[in-house]
Amino acid sequence: METLLGLLILWLQLQWVSSKQEVTQIPAALSVPEGENLVLNCSFTDSAIYNLQWFRQDPGKGLTSLLLIQSSQREQTSGRLNASLDKSSGRSTLYIAASQPGDSATYLCAAMNSGYSTLTFGKGTMLLVSPDIQNPDPAVY
């Protein structure tokens, strides 16, 4: 009986380890000119997710939630932002249309697995949007 119980505990531990979520974001940093449409990528290892969220973090500040995609959804849109979710391939993409210097921040994706109450975060993508200085606003002195 003890052997059976030991095997059951070992099996449960292996199941927990094998189902541990890993979230990866590539590239780690991205620099684009103002006005460019851009794509940020996120991949996750366990497709049994409850939802996936995209956040932004400005230097020295906390996280700001941008979009949340439930596992039953394929995409979410808010203004110039659009996030897609493909559970079968373990990928999510955040599209930012007509980038602006104010979009410069670190963008993070996080997956919440079914049955768990914790988010697993990627390491983030640091985005720098360079202003268009070819047509600067006139300065009045």
Over which residues does each language-model region extend?
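N-terminal Sec-dependent signal peptide, specifically the hydrophobic helical h-region
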Residues: 1-27, 108-116, 121, 134
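Surface-exposed, proline-enriched loop/turn segments that connect beta strands in immunoglobulin-like
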Residues: 24-29, 139-141
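Extracellular beta-strand/loop-rich beta-sandwich domains predominantly from IgSF
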Residues: 28-31, 79-102
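Solvent-exposed, conformationally flexible loop/turn segments
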Residues: 33-35
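Structural signature of extracellular immunoglobulin-like
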Residues: 37-46, 51-58, 95-98, 103-113
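N-terminal V-set
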Residues: 47-78
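Short beta-strand edge segments in extracellular beta-sheet folds
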Residues: 126-130
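Extracellular/luminal ectodomains of metazoan preproproteins built from arrays
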Residues: 131-141
